[in-house]
Amino acid sequence: VNQIGSVTESIEAVKAALVSHGAGVAVVGRKINLAGGPSYTVELGRFDGLVSRALYGLSKLPELGTHGLTLICISWALRVMSNVHDFFVHVAAKVESIHQYIESMRYGSLSPTIFDNYSKDCMIAHGAAHFLKXRPPDPAETRGGAVADNGSGAVARMPTLEEYGTNLTKLAEEGKANFDAAMVKLKNFSFILMFGVLGTIISFCLISSGAVLLLKHHVFPDSNINPSSGAAITSGVRGDLRAYVVAYLDPSRTSFTVDNAIYGEIRRTVLAWLIDSGTLQLSEKVLALVLTMVAATVLGVAKSMIKMGQIEVLTGTQGEIRAAEIVVEQLHAESGKPVLVALTGSIDKMTKDNVLNKTCK
């Protein structure tokens, strides 16, 4: 616990500066949007509510006893890693795109699609993969890491935590190179703002190459949930306690990117630890909270269940998901399995709220 605390504390010490610089780049993106281009925003701390607060609440339950503090430390580690990803993908990777968009405006050839293409190429180049769209894979195909459908129907292994750290380091180096090139063309922007972004990129190099791998050794020695732990999780759920989860997918990106794989692996580690330590053995109340109240953890459980062929997968556009509750009930009745609903396309708030209320029981 002390080692985890020292690692996360050192990263948290510089996070405030990263947030400030990231917000500055988001402002640049909004200004470009006003000129007619696509909008790019940065979701800062998007897992704060889903992970940190939820795990903090769980840590206060008497059933957890002295293990509560460990959960708090793990939640902080998740939050730090979440922010590292946010700044990499939503800030650093956009600098070159902003430069390209400005160039297209300067020479009179407006091409907003350049953003989408760059975004997709960036994701694909660094290990992005599509989520399962059809059958649950054979367990023999999934040993050694999470799996994904790459769009061709073939099942591919998702990156491990160590591989993810390596990818982040590579992305940091390429992101800095892109930034250096863009700096020459972006001299009309505030030098102070650009200096701040440069500091952010450099910080990424340090964080991705050091902190992510340190967290691996100190927090997550084995990120794969074993079949016995998975069976314990699912067998302890009441028949009317449905482990549904709704995932909203950005249509301009691949369905589930590398970060989802790593967070899913970490969540499975947390659950496996809870099961193996005996914490959840006799506590249906805590098990119900983990499976139904903590959205991020439910997503990890769902992926584990898919690996073991214990969950159905449903995808659809906004028009199709208005009947999602009926479809989910039908699949659940036919298969007797929980259902993961993965929604694609743009989702309006009303539809999102309705589906969440109906399917996330």
UniProtKB/Swiss-Prot annotation:
Keyword annotations: Glycoprotein, Hydrogen peroxide, Oxidoreductase, Peroxidase, Secreted
Known catalytic reactions: 2 a phenolic donor + H2O2 = 2 a phenolic radical donor + 2 H2O
Lineage: superkingdom: Eukaryota
Gene Ontology CC: one annotated term: extracellular region
Signal peptide (UniProt feature, chain positions): none
Entry PTM: Partially N-glycosylated.
Entry GO MF terms: heme binding; lactoperoxidase activity
GO BP terms, alphabetized: hydrogen peroxide catabolic process; response to oxidative stress
Disulphide bridges: none
Main location: secreted
Cited InterPro entries: Haem_peroxidase
Location within or outside the cell: Secreted
EC number: 1.11.1.7
Homology family: Belongs to the peroxidase family.
Name assigned to this protein: Peroxidase A
Organism: Aloe vera
Upper classification of the organism: Eukaryota, Viridiplantae, Streptophyta, Embryophyta, Tracheophyta
